[in-house]
Structures are given as C-alpha cells and as structure tokens.
C-alpha cells in the first residue's frame, strides 16, 4: 500500500467464470476499498468501476460516458470488506481463464477522499465539496445520467480559475474553456457552472480527490479556505 498514491493497491487475477472473492492488501492499513477499477488484459472488454456511493449492484465504465449499469455479474451484489472484494460472472470482471488487473483505492484522512455530491444547478452558489485536503487531482463522473468523465489537476496552470482538465474516455486535447473549471481551496473545491456534466440540479456525481504532499502542523497546506 502506498500513501503517495492515495492508498491504492494493484492485483492481477485469473477469472473463473463463477462468482467469488479476490483478496486485497488494503486491510493492513485497516481500510476497505471505496473505489475499484478492473480491466481485462487478454481480450477486448470494458473497464469496470465500483464506487461505494453507487453501490454494490452497479458499475460505471471508464471507457464510456454512459450512466451506471446494474447487475449481480459485476460485484455479486456484495460490498468489499477489509480483506476481499467480490466479483460476479460478467466478462468485464470474471470470464473463465481471463486475465485481469484490479486497482483498489481507499481514503487517507487529510490526503484523499472518495465520495459523491449532488448538484444544485447554480453557478453563483454552487455546492462546496469538502475533501479535507487541497486537491491536486480530481477524477469525477455523473453517474445518474450519460455524461463524460473528467480529470482536473492544479499543476498544469496552478491557480484559480485555470485548473484545466481532460476527458479520460475521449482522445480530446486538454479542455481550456471556462465552463468546466473548478475553484480549488485548501479543504475542497467548488464547480462554478450550471453545465450538467458537473452541476445539474439534482444530478448525482461521484469523485475521487487526491491531495498534495502533506505539510504543516495540520497536514493541510493553507493557501485559501472556503467558509461557505
């Protein structure tokens, strides 16, 4: 387990075609995976992602802008534990003889956050997403409707409002417009837009945020703070 990667561990496994469990190493840190990314290596198939806010009956595909799919074939309708995660019989996660890689993520307080938020459709008073750290990397996706994945970082330019992003499910170049640019603070971020990709009224969004190197007495660099 590497704290520098927000607490993630990687595993290769062979599919059996029957539901079962895969051991992970995050339990050594007392952690339960909140996000799992699975990809078949030996044959063309979709990326398959578990996110605990979406639940153990659903999955999101990394290579698509689709909303969630439902079925026991993905996670066997079972949430991860501190020692294993479950898989069903879908070819995306468990075809007999298939070769797979799984990347499991959990949280470290003050450094990473895996959670969700609900949009309010307001650009003047958007939702503030509390992460407990200053985000350096944010992966997000609307999961209740079709829309693109989006990755934001605060290093390309490094100041508000120029935290540009990319679409991991597309081959587009970096987006440098002003519609999808968040404001990053020492304890979270806001999405000052009404665009449904990030802030539809009532829209359901999942995200994973990773912070910068822990520094200071409170382990959070303070460059700006959101007071609401």
Predicted regions and their residues:
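Contiguous ligand/interfacial binding patches
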Residues: 51-98, 153-201
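GGW-centered surface loops in extracellular recognition modules
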Residues: 8-52, 103, 130, 214-228
């Amino acid at each position: 387990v590497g704290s520098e990667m927000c607490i993630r561990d990687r595993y290769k496994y062979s599919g059996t075609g029957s539901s079962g469990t895969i051991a992970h190493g995050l339990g050594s840190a007392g952690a339960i995976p909140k996000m799992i990314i699975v990809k078949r290596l030996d044959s063309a198939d979709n990326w398959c992602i578990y996110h605990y806010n979406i639940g153990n009956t659903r999955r999101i595909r990394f290579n698509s802008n689709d909303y969630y799919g439902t079925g026991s074939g993905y996670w066997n309708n079972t949430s991860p534990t501190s020692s294993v995660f479950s898989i069903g019989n879908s070819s995306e996660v468990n075809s007999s003889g298939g070769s797979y890689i799984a990347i499991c993520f959990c949280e470290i307080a003050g450094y990473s956050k895996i959670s969700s938020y609900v949009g309010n459709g307001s650009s003047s008073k958007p939702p503030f997403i509390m992460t407990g750290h200053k985000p350096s990397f944010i992966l997000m996706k609307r999961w209740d409707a079709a829309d693109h994945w989006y990755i934001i970082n605060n290093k390309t330019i490094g100041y508000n409002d120029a935290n540009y992003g990319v679409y991991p499910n597309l081959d587009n170049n970096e987006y440098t417009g002003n519609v999808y640019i968040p404001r990053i603070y020492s304890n979270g971020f806001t999405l000052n837009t009404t665009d449904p990709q990030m802030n539809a009224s009532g829209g359901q969004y999942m995200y994973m945020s990773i912070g910068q190197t822990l520094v200071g007495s409170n382990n959070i660099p303070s460059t700006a703070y959101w007071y609401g």
